[in-house]
């Protein structure tokens, strides 16, 4: 496997604004991964200001993410959230099959339940040259999920496609 599925790859074939690509990508990725919600968090690594730029939900019963305005990241976030700390350190993306049983050194169960409410997730780190520019987070709410090799491949491919677009988006909006 070396290529993205064509429905996802086609999104990147035209010259579009990053926000338009994100809005088009998330619903298709949600269907491809069979998940309940996907959001894209973007951040300026110099100022540590970030926001959710796009969120897709399978149904309206799935909770939305309410971080659509630029805001300063709490200084305590990396201490509270080991997934975010891993992302800040440009570690490989993390695939969590079950928040309830995950290693507490990797997942703060209480933080995940309170903040996001999901059961399984992918914490895809959008990094360049050791700097975190964003996080793509597909997730499942009803039950744990075993992430397949094909899911991992899609995320790895998307990380390389999305990261430059996130950087462009940040540079366009954070002047």
Language model features with spans:
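Soluble sensory domains of the PAS superfamily and closely related sensory modules
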Residues: 85-94, 101-104
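Short regulatory alpha-helical segment in sensory/regulatory domains of signaling proteins that mediates
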Residues: 9-16, 25-34, 42-44, 88, ...
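Regulatory loop-to-helix N-cap segments in sensory/regulatory domains
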Residues: 139-158, 165-174
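Sensory-domain boundary capping and coupling elements
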Residues: 84, 126-141
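Signal-transducing coupling segments at domain and membrane junctions
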Residues: 97-120
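Signal-transmission linkers at sensory-effector interfaces
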Residues: 1-23, 31, 52, 168-175
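A short, aliphatic-rich beta-strand micro-motif
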Residues: 119-127
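GAF sensory/regulatory domain recognition
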Residues: 39-75, 79
């Amino acid at each position: 496997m070396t290529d993205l599925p064509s429905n996802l790859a086609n999104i990147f074939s035209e010259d579009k604004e990053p926000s338009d690509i994100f809005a088009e990508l998330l619903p298709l990725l949600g269907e491809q991964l069979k998940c309940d919600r996907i959001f894209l968090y973007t951040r300026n690594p110099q100022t540590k200001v970030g926001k959710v730029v796009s969120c897709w939900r399978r149904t309206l019963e799935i909770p939305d993410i309410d971080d659509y305005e630029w805001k300063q990241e709490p200084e305590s976030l990396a201490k509270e959230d080991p997934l975010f700390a891993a992302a800040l350190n440009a570690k490989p993306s993390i695939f969590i099959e079950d928040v309830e049983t995950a290693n507490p050194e990797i997942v703060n169960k209480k933080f995940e339940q309170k903040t996001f409410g999901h059961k399984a997730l992918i914490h895809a780190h959008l990094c360049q040259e050791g700097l975190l520019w964003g996080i793509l987070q597909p997730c499942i709410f009803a039950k744990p999920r075993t992430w397949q090799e094909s899911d991992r491949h899609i995320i790895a491919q998307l990380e390389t496609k999305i990261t430059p677009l996130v950087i462009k988006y940040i540079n366009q909006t954070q002047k």
